[in-house]
Amino acid sequence: MCIRDSIPTTLPKGSTTMGKITFERSIEDVAGEVAQFTGFSQAMTYSFESPKVFDKLKLAEDSEYRKAVVISNPLGEDFSIMRTIPVNGMLSSLSTNFNRRNKNVKLYELAKVYIASDDKNELPDERVMFTLGAFGEVDFFSMKGVVEEFLERIGMKNKPEYDPAAGISFLHPGRQADIIYDGTKIGYIGELHPDVADNYALGERTYLVVIDLATVTGMASFDRKFNGIAKFPAVTRDISMVMPKSVLVGNVEKIIEKLGYEVKKIEDVK
């Protein structure tokens, strides 16, 4: 038996936990900041899509993107699956703007895709994708610049490589590339295929970038290192080289970096 008078008198107490943003959310925040800083506006599209999207994007019949999660009680066929690729919503938004006679449109989206598991009892793999889409006063290289700015902001200091043999059906065959960082594919970039552009009623050259933030998160770091001031003044030298058009600039940079030199600026003089 416990007597009330034997319970000691104390003041109420409790502990608080300081809230913080997760590392993954920090990466997303940086992606949004970089996109907005470079002139992109945020788009928000549905995660529900129609199976007709796959044909609209010219995806192969055996494409992994066709293995979608089917909704058991959809609102209709147009909302009957969960998206496996983020570009349909982006292209639909760009198409709406183009049809409203907006001549210079740059959009970005941070949204999940849902990759179905082979085991139907398991939940799908949800991956956040950073998607950029634009037409008008934009080209392949300006989109490439946004990619590199984002990677640098999240501590990925090495320059990404661009593999032109991407083989993405909805991008222009000669104007697309996988984005490779330290040997790992983190996304892709390119100009929209003309046939797909017609499917979305886009009459301008349209450019897309898709970066898998789930992959990028494992490589990113917000740690900063500072180097001491050099004892001696820097020495710079301008070097000009004449090369065939078939030589990729990235390969030239690799050779220079292997020799221990830092490339400050490369210009294409014709």
Where do the language-model regions lie?
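Extended, well-folded interaction surfaces typified by the phenylalanyl-tRNA synthetase beta subunit core
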Residues: 4-103, 268-270
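A carboxyl-terminal module marker
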Residues: 4-9, 16, 119-120, 125-126, ...
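Generic recognition of stable, solvent-exposed alpha-helical segments in well-folded globular domains
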Residues: 22, 26-33, 38-39, 43, ...
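Short, well-ordered loop/turn and helix-capping segments at boundaries between secondary-structure elements
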Residues: 37-41, 92-96, 100, 116, ...
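Hydrophobic pocket-lining residues within nucleotide cofactor-binding pockets
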Residues: 48, 114, 216
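Polyanion/phosphate-binding surface patch
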Residues: 72-74, 103, 107-137
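Short beta-strands and strand-coil junctions in structured, solvent-facing domains, enriched
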Residues: 77, 97, 117, 195-197
